[in-house]
């Protein structure tokens, strides 16, 4: 096969349709089972849910997965509006009052009983914040706000508390926070290809420019079972960050954003406006299907918890120079913990309708326990299930099933003020107000006022903020509208 032909090859995954339509009785039963996790692990005093079964701690990422589960439970008829409202009111009230790391952003972890800051051993104290976790939370707060505008005021008040001074810079780079040996905050760039861009979409939905975080570069291509899979080419040895390639961020972007840009309000399920996210997702999927076809090993790779030490691993398609690398966050190679991730399997099933994902559904359908939800995964080596239950796994499974019924989970409310469903946004009106004393100190984004905001300002005598000087002009390599040239998808061993 000539190089040109290789470059023009289309992966089979690109032709697989997504699954859309009402849930079957079988699929609805899976949704009901997944929701049981959030019944068993709910903390009524705070409205939070344990990230791991019977362990009273959570993160912003896992709490966003709870919002996904809560939305799916209501939309799929598992709970009614009263139950949904009561849970969401309590959750948002807690999120609006939790102590923040350095009075800036949500801490990396909270005790679900007390809603106080804790470390990863659930001991009181603050340890930093994660821009990746917060990006997922921002995305789900936006979904809640758009789907249920009656809660928009509560959602906006949550985000208006946050000080974005250190989490995002003028070039659109996302940073996390840690504490040094003297308990002083240290801010470092956070995120690698896939996770970084997924989190950036959450910030974009609130008006932030995430130019550096949202671009695919720098990346290289790994030849994995005939598929050229993109991976982040920043050196893990010098950056102390592993370049995990996992299913999860690509699946989540597909389920929640429809592989669209953050400003795409189209309801067309067949079109995907993001310039490369679907293409890269197809590659990550295809490498896993090809692995099954070539080796006979069912594959659905993602990060997951364990029921034994080391308790958490990144189970990857590629990481740190190796295909199918299963490592801890410290980089220790632990191949015996490789597993079929249930959330990855069901997410792939929703986004790629194929005989392979049919088989994945068959193997995971009953992999759970009554009142606990679904297992975290099934060991690839045949050692049985990972007998651990988590909010993230069950939450993503629920949103995958909701995607089948409703399509893209982010559904914008109308921005037509004459429409009865229109909801004015406290966030937007605060951001355009030149007299608000926290807009600049909290590094809130500048948004261009639309007709509704201009009209509101004229009616109330509020002066509009002027566009700031081009702070991002010092970032010449980053252009939001830069054209994207997709790399070749396959090597010569894949037949056209």
Model-assigned labels for residue ranges:
Residues 1-487, 493-496:
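Ser/Thr/Asn(+Pro)-rich, low-complexity disordered segments
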């Amino acid at each position: 096969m000539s190089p040109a032909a290789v470059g023009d090859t289309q992966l089979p995954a690109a032709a697989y349709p997504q699954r859309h339509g009402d849930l079957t009785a079988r699929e609805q039963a899976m949704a009901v089972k997944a929701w049981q996790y959030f019944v068993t692990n709910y903390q009524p005093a705070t409205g939070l849910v344990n990230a791991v079964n019977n362990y009273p701690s959570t993160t912003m990422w896992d709490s966003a997965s709870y919002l996904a589960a809560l939305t799916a439970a209501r939309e799929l008829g598992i709970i009614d509006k009263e139950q949904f409202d009561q849970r969401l009111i309590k959750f948002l009230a807690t999120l609006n009052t939790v102590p923040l790391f350095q009075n800036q952003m949500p801490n990396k972890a909270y005790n679900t009983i007390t809603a106080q800051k804790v470390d990863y051993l659930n001991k009181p104290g603050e340890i930093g914040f994660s821009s990746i976790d917060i990006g997922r939370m921002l995305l789900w707060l936006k979904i809640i706000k758009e789907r249920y505008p009656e809660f928009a005021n509560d959602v906006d008040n949550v985000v208006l508390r946050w000080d974005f001074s250190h989490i995002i810079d003028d070039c659109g780079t996302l940073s996390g926070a840690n504490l040094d040996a003297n308990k002083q905050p240290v801010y470092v760039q956070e995120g690698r290809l896939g996770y970084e861009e997924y989190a950036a979409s959450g910030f974009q939905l609130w008006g932030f420019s995430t130019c550096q975080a949202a671009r695919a570069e720098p990346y290289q291509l790994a030849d994995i079972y005939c598929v050229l899979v993109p991976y982040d080419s920043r050196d893990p040895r010098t950056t102390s960050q592993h370049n995990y390639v996992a299913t999860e961020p690509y699946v989540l972007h597909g389920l929640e954003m429809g592989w669209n840009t953050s400003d795409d309000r189209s309801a067309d399920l067949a079109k995907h406006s993001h310039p490369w996210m679907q293409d890269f997702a197809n590659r990550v999927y295809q490498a896993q299907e090809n692995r099954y076809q070539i080796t006979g090993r069912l594959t659905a790779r993602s990060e997951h918890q364990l029921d034994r030490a080391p308790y958490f691993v990144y189970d990857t398609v590629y990481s740190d120079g190796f295909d199918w690398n299963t490592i801890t966050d410290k980089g220790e190679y632990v191949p015996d913990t490789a597993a079929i991730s249930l959330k990855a399997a069901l997410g792939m099933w929703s986004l790629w309708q194929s005989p392979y994902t049919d088989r994945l559904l068959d193997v995971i359908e009953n992999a759970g326990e009554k009142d606990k939800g679904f297992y975290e995964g099934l060991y690839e080596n045949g050692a049985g299930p990972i007998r651990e239950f988590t909010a993230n796994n069950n939450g993503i499974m629920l949103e995958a099933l909701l995607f089948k019924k409703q399509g893209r989970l982010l559904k914008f409310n109308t921005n037509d003020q004459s429409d009865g469903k229109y909801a004015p946004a406290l966030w937007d009106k605060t951001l355009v107000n030149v007299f608000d004393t926290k807009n600049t100190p909290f590094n809130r984004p500048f948004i261009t006022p639309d007709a509704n905001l201009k009209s509101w300002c004229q009616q109330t005598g509020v002066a509009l903020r002027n566009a700031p000087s081009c702070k991002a002009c010092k970032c010449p390599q980053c252009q939001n509208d830069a054209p994207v040239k997709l790399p070749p998808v396959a090597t010569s061993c894949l037949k056209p």
